[in-house]
Amino acid sequence: MTESYFASIAPIEFEGAASENPLAYRYYDKNRVVLGKRMEDHLRMAVCYWHTFCSEGADMFGPGTFHRPWHIGPMDQAHAEHKLNEAFEFFTRLGLPFFCFHDTDVMAEAHTIREHVDNLARIGDRIQEKMAATGVKLLWGTANLFSHPRYMAGAASNPDPDVFRFAATQVRHCMDLTKRLGGQNYVLWGGREGYDSLLNTDLKQEKAQLGRFLKMVIEHKHKIGFSGTILIEPKPHEPTKHQYDFDVETVYSFLVANGLEKEVKLNIEANHATLAGHSFEHEIATAVALGVFGSIDMNRGDPQNGWDTDQFPNDVREITTALYYILLGGGFTTGGNNFDAKVRRQSFEPADLFYAHVGAVDTVAQGLINAAAMIEGGQLAGIVKERYAGWQGELGRAILDGKMSLEALSDGAVAEGITPRPRSGRQEMIENLVGRYL
């Protein structure tokens, strides 16, 4: 057997905060108990297949620089299995419990719809064997409905019903495989479900198609007995000018309009929040408040660039506040932290993939430790509770319970001659408080 591409890298171990080994975890101790649960079980971290094993390091101005062995030659079954073997070598050396994939990431290239179905089933057998041998689990699967030229005008929102049918075929078989592999979620990302120009777009028609597609996905989920969660991943633009799943609020409105808000949750990506003009924690807190928080694509964007840079997370403060709101919402159930991130074009050596993931894992672990301390301290929650205390009183409850009319409120306010006075929001004090946990 040919030596693994990653043979020079030993399994990554926890060595503690004092370690100077760049290929060791300093904060991620998977068995450390945080808020009554093992760190590994809190964070449920996953490696993504696409950026890690499919990216060739190309950009708009130059060709690939990575030259991985599995990038050479036609993407036939032998190459797909070569890539799969290396992927599981990476997963096991990194020691994370989950991975995620698109159908076309893992399978041999297909030239017909029949080949697509057959090739996916064939590689599915090999994936099942590798999972059984290593204990690595599948966080979620998804179908790539954006890369092939057939999807240049969208998949579910495409003007051509045959493209819609092809997309439906991919989703059906990818969900079937996800179920077979014990996947805990199935993701829908509408990379080209949007438009580049309104001049050739029928918005009402396309949104009706999207709604029907999603309903069929839910119907199939129940038909096959898939117990996982269906997730939608919001993104405002790129590759289209405007995407229909713009942000959390937009997706929630779409779900409500189609009566699916109890069936679907959201997979929130940090970089997509940046592109939508939101903070990462805003999108998380909004999803938690609306009851649709599901999972995380953990990465970072660059606020000075207007595109999806998909960098590995390294901002402990941002991750701390993000995880604080996740913990407040009860934490993950079927979801987790998928590292939807890629090494930079100049980082082409095998070790670079490990440096990137080790740093990201430790950043998230630090964030969890800090967020847990904030929860245990209780000061921030206490400040917020006190700020809204009036709504827990008799008047506040009567308003929210629908026992007061606009007229009654107005008459009472005038009769009492109320003179509300502003109260400080204490923003700077609260920011200082959070800083003490970092």
Swiss-Prot record:
InterPro entries: Xyl_isomerase-like_sf (IPR036237), Xyl_isomerase-like_TIM-brl (IPR013022), Xylose_isom_bac (IPR013452), Xylose_isomerase (IPR001998). The active site is at 102, 105. Its main location: cytoplasm. It is an enzyme of class 5 (isomerase). One of its GO terms (biological process) is D-xylose metabolic process. Its EC number is 5.3.1.5. Mg(2+) 1 binds at residues 233, 269, 297, 340. Signal peptide: none annotated. Keywords: Carbohydrate metabolism, Cytoplasm, Isomerase, Magnesium, Metal-binding, Xylose metabolism. It catalyses: alpha-D-xylose = alpha-D-xylulofuranose. GO terms for cellular component: cytoplasm. It comes from the Bacteria. GO terms for molecular function: magnesium ion binding; xylose isomerase activity. Gene3D superfamilies: Divalent-metal-dependent TIM barrel enzymes (3.20.20.150). It is found in: Cytoplasm. Mg(2+) 2 binds at residues 269, 272, 308, 310. Binds 2 magnesium ions per subunit. The keyword Isomerase applies. Belongs to the xylose isomerase family. HAMAP family: Xylose_isom_A (MF_00455). Homotetramer. This is Xylose isomerase. The lineage of its organism: Bacteria, Pseudomonadati, Acidobacteriota, Terriglobia, Bryobacterales.
